[in-house]
Amino acid sequence: MTASSGPGIALKGEAIGLAVIAELPLVIVNVQRGGPSTGLPTKTEQSDLFQALYGRNGEAPVPVIAAQTPGDCFYAAFEACEVAIKYRTPVFLLSDGYLANGSEPWSIPIFDDLPNIDPNFAVQNDDVAFMPYQRDKKTLARPWAIPGTSGLEHRIGGCLLYTSPSPRDS
């Protein structure tokens, strides 16, 4: 999870695009503020929707969720985490200065009553080869292989190379 406002999100555009192609579940909170460029940090505005939808190079779509009240911020963030993990994608959570600085009474949820978020980690099975490119038919997400787990490498016909080839070799 990371948070910023419009100018900071603009600087993170390439990394967000990389997270899309790498299928990394993460939540990006954008607390919107007014104006172009560095803008007006003390003026609130809801002007970053297009940035959230299209602010990356190429086709890198991401889900966008917006909180509607200060009390809704927790549930919107929880929903963003659910979507990010279930579908292996970055998710934008939009807020603004009014929500960031506002308050309202709300009941703190009982955490045992919240739905469980299952990351669907890949497990090594000696009987079946790990197929990282196979996807869940319902969500189209891949199992989440924990980096470094033996036998869960994403390798189809590749080979390990511990020395870089020299241009003279070609």
Give the role of each language-model region.
Residues 14, 54-57, 103-104, 111:
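Short capping/connector residues at structural and topological boundaries
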Residues 54-61, 159-160:
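Short acidic (Asp/Glu) and glycine-rich catalytic loops that position anionic groups and cofactors
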Residues 1-53, 63-84:
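Thiamine diphosphate
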Residues 35-38, 45-57, 115, 119, ...:
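Ligand-binding clefts of soluble mixed alpha/beta catalytic domains
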Residues 76-164, 168-170:
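Flexible, low-complexity linker and terminal segments
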